[in-house]
């Protein structure tokens, strides 16, 4: 109930205060475990992706946002789970894996933090999660939210906000232990699929990549 209500209100504010556009909604798989992977520009990106994708999303959020029982309860009710970025967070990884094993949808921002407009090098946890879950990957590119810094701007999003949803894809299943170079290569492949959904100026370290969505 809270998730649907929040998303409805977010759509209202987007339509009232911004030039909001979504392309590629038809690419969202209707069923099955799904990892939605996006670039990250603003604290309001999770809600922007949530209203743009037709399935119920759950996501990891930095643990510092879970301040106090009220905010913590609200975030969890909306679908968030705390991620401790200062260490290897086994609990959050297991939580995400359990959601996928129940055919759920997890939203991940592999860069690990907001970029300053162009993509930065992603962390390899997303590739490990894909390997352990066999989930389909859905790349998403967001532009226009980088000027919205404060999370309270969720009620007043302005500017040209574009969400581009790419074609879903899968990675080959690897048998046995996977070393760091292979995980990095898989992560780069995933992020390249995100980067081609963005204008060149947003692609950062993943610029000049082939457009897999054409």
Where are the regions that the model predicts?
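Residue-level preference for the first positions of well-ordered beta-strands
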Residues: 33-35, 103-109, 138
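Catalytic core of membrane glycerolipid acyltransferases/transacylases, capturing the structured
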Residues: 2, 6-8, 15-16, 28-87, ...
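Catalytic-site beta-strand/loop segments enriched in glycine and acidic/polar residues
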Residues: 99-126
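Membrane-interfacial terminal anchoring regions of lipid-handling membrane enzymes
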Residues: 1-8, 12-15, 21-30, 98-101, ...
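Alpha-helix C-terminal capping segments
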Residues: 51-54, 102, 131-136
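Short gly/ser/thr-rich secondary-structure transition/capping motifs
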Residues: 15-23, 87, 145-147
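A short, acidic/glycine-rich surface segment
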Residues: 44-45, 67-68, 91-92, 146-152, ...
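A cross-family acyltransferase "interaction/gating" segment
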Residues: 119-181, 211-213
């Amino acid at each position: 109930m809270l998730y649907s209500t929040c998303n409805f209100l977010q759509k209202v504010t987007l339509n009232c205060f911004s030039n909001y556009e979504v392309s590629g909604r038809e690419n969202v798989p209707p069923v099955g475990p799904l990892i939605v992977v996006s670039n990250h520009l603003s604290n309001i990106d999770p809600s922007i992706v949530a209203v743009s994708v037709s399935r119920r999303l759950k996501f990891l959020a930095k643990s510092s946002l879970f301040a106090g029982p009220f905010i913590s309860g609200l975030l969890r009710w909306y679908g968030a789970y705390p991620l401790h970025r200062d260490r290897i967070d086994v609990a959050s990884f297991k939580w995400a894996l359990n959601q996928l094993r129940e055919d759920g949808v997890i939203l991940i921002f592999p860069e690990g933090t907001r970029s300053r407009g162009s993509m930065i090098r992603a962390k390899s946890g997303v590739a490990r999660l894909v390997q352990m879950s066999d989930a389909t990957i859905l790349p998403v590119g967001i532009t226009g939210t980088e000027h919205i810094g404060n999370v309270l701007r969720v009620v007043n999003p302005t500017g040209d906000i574009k969400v581009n949803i790419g074609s879903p894809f899968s990675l080959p299943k690897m048998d046995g232990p996977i070393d760091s170079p292979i995980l990095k290569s898989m992560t780069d492949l995933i992020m390249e699929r995100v980067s081609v959904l963005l204008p060149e100026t947003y692609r950062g370290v993943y610029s000049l990549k082939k457009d897999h969505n054409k």
